[in-house]
Every structure is written in structure tokens, then in C-alpha cells.
């Protein structure tokens, strides 16, 4: 069963509310919100031992690509000494194209939409980390310099939707025709994806660049979650709208193991890309750069497997945003996670956010990490299958 969409009930009172009163109330709410965040003792540093690339500013609903491409960049920096040496010599940062991945995501979404004849199909901006690794495995990746950044995301979306609307009206769901028309729109707003690129004087395909030059193994990574509708130490689907092709390969852990695993991974120097909720009272991503569980959200409940499950089922936890975790610190016995966001350096804490352990336990739906970061005993629980 799909969990319900979060909604806001608005109660209308039979009183006259003046603009001045509204302004005063708004100011009070802002002051209370600021006071709440001022009292949160988040770490005041932004340093980390996990190498990662500079903060970017996404356009449109492509956080899933920005975060997971940043994750792959960080993985290259962690594992590929030759690429790191070449970057240092050239005084450059590794900069892979998020929109190359977005291009192929829309192609595959259109293909799936046509196969389902528009029924129970999703053609939205959203996506998840496994979309990126699957697409990089299938189509490779290219440097940012070799593929355009979209100039008007809204206009592109309008034109893409118009293609599907025309096919809905005609009833013609010929897959090749739908994909060809979608690609024409993408070629116009972005660019035709290159068949070859030149890197360090070598001509190579995007797949060769990904798997040989960067030495990425996109299929190696695990997505881990913690919900009770799938047996623990089994694999299943994360039932959220952005899982548009119903991927069912998530590894499901009990909450204690789920938390221990991400802590262990970050402490050992592995980057982790996380799928998180966005809009609680205790979160100020672009302002204070803090995300914690506000006491009002708990209503006296403990933070445990049952409350995590309940908030997911009842729609209080939704998959709103994907970001990259690049550090874990324990301050006065409290877990904190340093997050590289994709809203530019003017948001949050110079583009970073500190997530507290309670938020990680309650509002982070899943994360992707290299299985080498896992305790071998956990891998054994899954039959040793990496």
C-alpha cells in the first residue's frame, strides 16, 4: 500500500483577522523558530576527512542526480589514485555531468511510461540513487564540460509533458515514437549526448570513461533501508513515488544496525548518499543549516523502529531530497552528520547542513554506500551476496 501524501488541514475561524495581526503572528512564529535553532548545539566546524567535490547549485528537481553523482565523484577520489594525481597536476576538481544522467533518466522514464501506456506510470522530476548507478552502468558518464546544463528547467518540463499528453490523447503508445520525441525535446533543451569524449588526450566512450578511466563499478553499491514491511536481512522495494520503476533491491536492516552501519561507514572514510525528508519544524536546510526532530513531532513517542515505521506509513516521512553525507561526529554523546547539499554555497552553512542522530533515525528513508563499509557479519546475514 502506498503511504498517503502529507496534507495540511486549514481551519477557518469566524473572526476578523487583520493584516496587522497576521504580521504580528508571523513575526512571532519566525522568532520562535529562530530561538529553537539558536538553542541547538550543532557542531561549528565544516571539516571532514572524506574527500568530496565543491558545492553546486542544482536546477529543477534533480537532487537525486546531484547527490549521487557527487557520491560517485567522492568514490573516485577515495579509490582512484591515478585520477587524483592527474587532477592535482592539472589543479582541477573532478566534475561529472549531472544532466547527462538526467537526460538518460527522462529517456528511460518515457520508455517505461510508453510500456505501461501511461497507466500506473510516473514521469516526474524525481529519482533515487539506484537510478544514477543503473544509468551510469548502461550509458556511462561524461565530464561536466562535455554536456550542457539546462538553462530553463521549467520550459523543458513543459515540453516533455506536452509529448506525453499528445500520446495520451491519441492513444498511440508506440515505444520508439515516444522515446524519439522525448529525445528531440531533450536534445533541444540540453544537447545530444556525446558518443565519444576526449580525456587526457584519449578518445573514449562515456562507458569507457566511467568504468575504465574512473574505474567505477556502478553495480557494486548497496541501498540500505529500515522498515518492517520487508523481512529484516532481506531485500525489497522502498514504496515511494520516486521509485518510478519499482526497484526492489533495497537491503533491509533493523534500525540499530541501520544506524550502526552508516556511522561505521562514515567513520571509516566512506561517503554515503542519503534519501531524506525535507519539511519538518525541526529542519532549516537553507537557513540555520540544521535538521533535528522537533519535540512537537514526537508527541511523547520514543525514537525507535515502531515510530519510524508509523511516520512513514502515515506520510510524516516522505522522500523529498537526496544529499551526500561526508562526516559523522559525536558531540556530548549525540550523533551528528555533516551533509553536502546541492542548493549552492549561500544556503545553510556555506552549502552544508548538520543532521542530528534523531533525524537520521526517523527521517532518512534509505542510504547508498559501498558494501566494503559494512560489517562482514551483516553481509553474511544477506547470504554473503555483495
Per-region residue spans from a language model:
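Alpha-helical support elements that line or immediately flank enzyme active sites
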Residues: 64-80
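Bacterial N-terminal signal peptides
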Residues: 9-20
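Second-shell loop/turn segments in exported
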Residues: 49-61, 117-124, 171, 245-252, ...
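Active-site signature of cysteine proteases
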Residues: 31, 180-386
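Papain-like cysteine protease catalytic cores
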Residues: 91-200
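Bacterial N-terminal signal peptides that target proteins for export
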Residues: 1-9
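Structural recognition of the beta-strand scaffold that forms the well-ordered cores
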Residues: 62-65, 97-103, 132-135, 143-145, ...
Amino acid at each position: 500500500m502506498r503511504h498517503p501524501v502529507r496534507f495540511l488541514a486549514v481551519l477557518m475561524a469566524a473572526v476578523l483577522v487583520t493584516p496587522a495581526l497576521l504580521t504580528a503572528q508571523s513575526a512571532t512564529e519566525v522568532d520562535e523558530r529562530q530561538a529553537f535553532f539558536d538553542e541547538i548545539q550543532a557542531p561549528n566546524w565544516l571539516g571532514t576527512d572524506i574527500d568530496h567535490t565543491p558545492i553546486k547549485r542544482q536546477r529543477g528537481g534533480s537532487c537525486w542526480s546531484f547527490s549521487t553523482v557527487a557520491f560517485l565523484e567522492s568514490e573516485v577520489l577515495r579509490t582512484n589514485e591515478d585520477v587524483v594525481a592527474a587532477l592535482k597536476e592539472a589543479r582541477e576538481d573532478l566534475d561529472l555531468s549531472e544532466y547527462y544522467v538526467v537526460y538518460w533518466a527522462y529517456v528511460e522514464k518515457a520508455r517505461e511510461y510508453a510500456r505501461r501506456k501511461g497507466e500506473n506510470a510516473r514521469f516526474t522530476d524525481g529519482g533515487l540513487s539506484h537510478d544514477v548507478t543503473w544509468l551510469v552502468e548502461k550509458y556511462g558518464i561524461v565530464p561536466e564540460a562535455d554536456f550542457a546544463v539546462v538553462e530553463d528547467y521549467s520550459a523543458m518540463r513543459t515540453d516533455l509533458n506536452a509529448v506525453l499528453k499528445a500520446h495520451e490523447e491519441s492513444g498511440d503508445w508506440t515505444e520508439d515514437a515516444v522515446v524519439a520525441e522525448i529525445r528531440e525535446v531533450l536534445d533541444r533543451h540540453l544537447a545530444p549526448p556525446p558518443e565519444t569524449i576526449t580525456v587526457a588526450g584519449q578518445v573514449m566512450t562515456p562507458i569507457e570513461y566511467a568504468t575504465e578511466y574512473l574505474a567505477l563499478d556502478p553495480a557494486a553499491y548497496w541501498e540500505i533501508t529500515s522498515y518492517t514491511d520487508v523481512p529484516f536481512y532481506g531485500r525489497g522495494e522502498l514504496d515511494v513515488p520516486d521509485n518510478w520503476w519499482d526497484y526492489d533491491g533495497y537491503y533491509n536492516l533493523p534500525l540499530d544496525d541501520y544506524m550502526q552501519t552508516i556511522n561505521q561507514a562514515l567513520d571509516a572514510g566512506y561517503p554515503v548518499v542519503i534519501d531524506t525528508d525535507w519539511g519538518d519544524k525541526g529542519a532549516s536546510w537553507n537557513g540555520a543549516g540544521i535538521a533535528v526532530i522537533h519535540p512537537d513531532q514526537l508527541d511523547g513517542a520514543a525514537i525507535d523502529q515502531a515510530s519510524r515505521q508509523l511516520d512513514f506509513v502515515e506520510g510524516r516521512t516522505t522522500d523529498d531530497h537526496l544529499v551526500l553525507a561526508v562526516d559523522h561526529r559525536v558531540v556530548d554523546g549525540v550523533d551528528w552528520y555533516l551533509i553536502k547539499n546541492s542548493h549552492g554555497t549561500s544556503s545553510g552553512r556555506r552549502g552544508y547542513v548538520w543532521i542530528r542522530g534523531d533525524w537520521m533515525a526517523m527521517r532518512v528513508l534509505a542510504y547508498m554506500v559501498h558494501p566494503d563499509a559494512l560489517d562482514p557479519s551483516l553481509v553474511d546475514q544477506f547470504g554473503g551476496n555483495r
